[in-house]
Each structure stands twice: as structure tokens, then as C-alpha cells.
């Protein structure tokens, strides 16, 4: 199921409150066949209907039966990703995982009212995301150091670095970048005709001045640097945190910031600074040894369409990966360490 854009939600709610309720009351006769609809991300009303994609557990008919039993009550249902509750009194649906709401309506059923898959609907967000705010470009959610999620990230870092150096780990929640990544993954699976694409969690070290830009726009080697581009002109990732740490800089922005607050450049050592490293989800797919001249992965068969997905330092034991398409990357975690 999909989340509605907040601005669209409020506009539709205002229009809906002026028209639909009166129309429903006037037309509520015993021989009317009613359907139940939700306001989709595309701005159109889609009918509730079980389907193989979302695995929705409730149908329009189920909702109507519940409504007739108790017009001021509610009904709960699930999809493959989330649990929901429909409130008949409010005529709204709430995602019990994220807390997000969207409008629903009861309207006369017609053949044209059947639901359909809209091409520009949003892809469901990961179920472990929390307090999602769709009105900001991204969110940094601090992970508690006792959680499984924190320890999973810290253990990957700790394979080649001392995990006690970690100051904090934050989850990056960027719906736009997540959708781009998911659509790219689906595209590659369709192109290859395979059920899964080779995907790895890889590290990327960078200067602190680029952190916010990466969280908003994703990685861009033209801006973030390419560290020599030995294996191609793309974004570089490493299997080992120790390697990526070589490119992390605790360059505070910058000397002027301290001077404005009355701190001299000589006193900067009194302030503890931290370095930043990303742990990204990367679709490495099919890879080949890289070359400094590559602007994109080379062809598998000499054609212009059948290309590798990424380049590496050594196909037998890859430690460095180069990705040329940002949509193959989702910057998932930001690790601050000293």
C-alpha cells in the first residue's frame, strides 16, 4: 500500500469534506453497490482489492461489511510490509508502523472503479524505518547501541577497525533515493532475467563537507572525488572499513567557524573532532576488472547494450568496487568515529 503526499493529502481532504460526505448520505440506498477507495500517491482514488503485489488482506467488500456493522467503528488489515487501521468515523487510514495517514472514501461502485497499478506510485519504505517525515529531503535516525541493527553495522566496521572508535551510527532515511535504488534493482533483475541481483554492504570514506550532499543527492564522483580513478571514473566503495578510513577527513568547516565563536585556530585541538564514513547498500551485479579509462562498465560481448554492472580491483577477491550509476547505491548508514 502507498503513502500519500502530505500537501496532496490536505488539498484532497478539504475537497473531500465539502462534497463526498453529502454525496454518500444522499445516495445511501439499499440497492446501491458501494466500493471503498484510498487516495494513492498519484493523486487518484484506487479501490481496496487483494492483489499479488501488495498482498493486501482486505477487500472493498470486507470493508463495506464492517462499515455496515458499525459505521463509527474500525477495521484492521495487513499488507506484505505494514499493518493498517481504517477509522470509519474519521474516514482515514493509518499505517500502524509509520503513523502516516491517508484519506479513504466510500463511493458507488462502477466498472471504471476497479483498481489499477499506477506507474508513479511510491515504493513501500523499509519496515524498520521510523518517524518518517516526507516533508524533508532526508532524516538521520540515531541507532541505540543495544539494538541488533546498531551491532550489525558496528560488527561490519569492526572486522578491520576497532569498533570502540565509533561515536555514533545513524540510519539515513531518504525516500527518493530509496525509490531510485529499488527501481534500478527491479530493472536489473528484469534485464538479466534473474530473481536476485548481487548486492553488498560496502564502505565509503569521505570528507565531512560532503556528508549532507550525499545524504540528499547520493554519491557523485564528480563532486566527492575519485581518489585517482585507478579502476574507472565512478564512485569507489570498499569491502573493508579500514581501507575507506584512509579517505575520511575530520576537516571541520572550517577555521572560520571556530573564530566566529571566539576559538582560535591554535585552540582547535581542545575540541574533539570526528570522521565520517558511509555504509552503503550497493548493487554490484556482474563485475569485471576496472581500468582508469572506463567512464562506464565495459561491454560483455562487444555490444553497446550488454554491459557489466560495476568494476573491481580483482575479480577473484574483490576489495574495491567502482559504481558508475548512482541509482545502484543507497547510502544507508552514517558512521561517526574518531
From Swiss-Prot:
Origin species: Homo sapiens
Signal peptide start and end residues: none
Gene: PARP11
Keyword hit for Nucleotidyltransferase: yes
CDD domains cross-referenced by the UniProt entry: TCCD_inducible_PARP_like (cd01439)
Family membership noted in the UniProt record: Belongs to the ARTD/PARP family.
UniProt modified residues of type ADP-ribosyl glutamic acid: 13
PTM per Swiss-Prot/TrEMBL: Auto-mono-ADP-ribosylated.
Domain PARP catalytic: start-end pairs: 123-338
Documented effect of changing residue 205 to W: No effect on subcellular location at the nuclear envelope
Modified residues annotated as ADP-ribosylcysteine in this record: 56, 72
N6-(ADP-ribosyl)lysine PTM positions: 18
Annotated consequence of substituting residue 93 to A: Loss of subcellular location at the nuclear envelope
Record-given protein name: Protein mono-ADP-ribosyltransferase PARP11
EC number: 2.4.2.-
Amino acid at each position: 500500500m502507498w503513502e500519500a503526499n502530505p500537501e496532496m493529502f490536505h488539498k484532497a481532504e478539504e475537497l473531500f469534506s465539502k462534497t463526498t460526505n453529502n454525496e454518500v448520505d444522499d445516495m445511501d440506498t439499499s440497492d446501491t453497490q458501494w466500493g471503498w477507495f484510498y487516495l494513492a500517491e498519484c493523486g487518484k482514488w484506487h479501490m481496496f482489492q487483494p492483489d499479488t503485489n501488495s498482498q493486501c488482506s482486505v477487500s472493498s467488500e470486507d470493508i463495506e461489511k464492517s462499515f455496515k456493522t458499525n459505521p463509527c467503528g474500525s477495521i484492521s488489515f495487513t499488507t506484505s510490509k505494514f499493518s493498517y487501521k481504517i477509522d470509519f468515523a474519521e474516514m482515514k487510514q493509518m499505517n500502524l508502523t509509520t503513523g502516516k495517514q491517508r484519506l479513504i472514501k466510500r463511493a458507488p461502485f462502477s466498472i471504471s472503479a476497479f483498481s489499477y497499478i499506477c506507474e508513479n506510485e511510491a515504493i513501500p519504505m523499509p519496515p524498520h524505518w521510523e518517524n518518517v517525515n516526507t516533508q524533508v529531503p532526508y532524516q538521520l535516525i540515531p541507532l541505540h547501541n543495544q539494538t541488533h541493527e546498531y551491532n550489525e553495522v558496528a560488527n561490519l566496521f569492526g572486522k578491520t577497525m576497532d569498533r570502540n572508535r565509533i561515536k555514533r551510527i545513524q540510519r539515513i532515511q531518504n525516500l527518493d533515493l530509496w525509490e531510485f535504488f529499488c527501481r534500478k534493482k527491479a530493472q536489473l533483475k528484469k534485464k538479466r532475467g534473474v530473481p536476485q541481483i548481487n548486492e553488498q554492504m560496502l564502505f565509503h570514506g569521505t570528507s565531512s563537507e560532503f556528508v549532507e550532499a550525499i545524504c540528499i543527492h547520493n554519491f557523485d564522483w564528480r563532486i566527492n572525488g575519485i581518489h585517482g580513478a585507478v579502476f574507472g571514473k565512478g564512485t569507489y566503495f570498499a569491502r573493508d572499513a579500514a581501507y575507506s578510513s584512509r579517505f575520511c577527513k575530520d576537516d571541520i568547516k572550517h577555521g572560520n567557524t571556530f573564530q566566529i565563536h571566539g576559538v582560535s585556530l591554535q585552540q582547535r585541538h581542545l575540541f574533539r573532532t570526528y570522521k565520517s564514513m558511509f555504509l552503503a547498500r550497493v548493487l554490484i551485479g556482474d563485475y569485471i576488472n576496472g581500468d582508469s579509462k572506463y567512464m562506464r562498465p565495459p561491454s560483455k560481448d562487444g555490444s553497446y547494450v550488454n554491459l557489466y554492472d560495476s568494476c573491481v580491483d580483482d575479480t577473484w577477491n574483490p576489495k574495491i568496487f567502482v559504481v558508475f550509476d548512482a541509482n545502484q547505491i543507497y547510502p544507508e548508514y552514517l558512521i561517526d568515529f574518531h
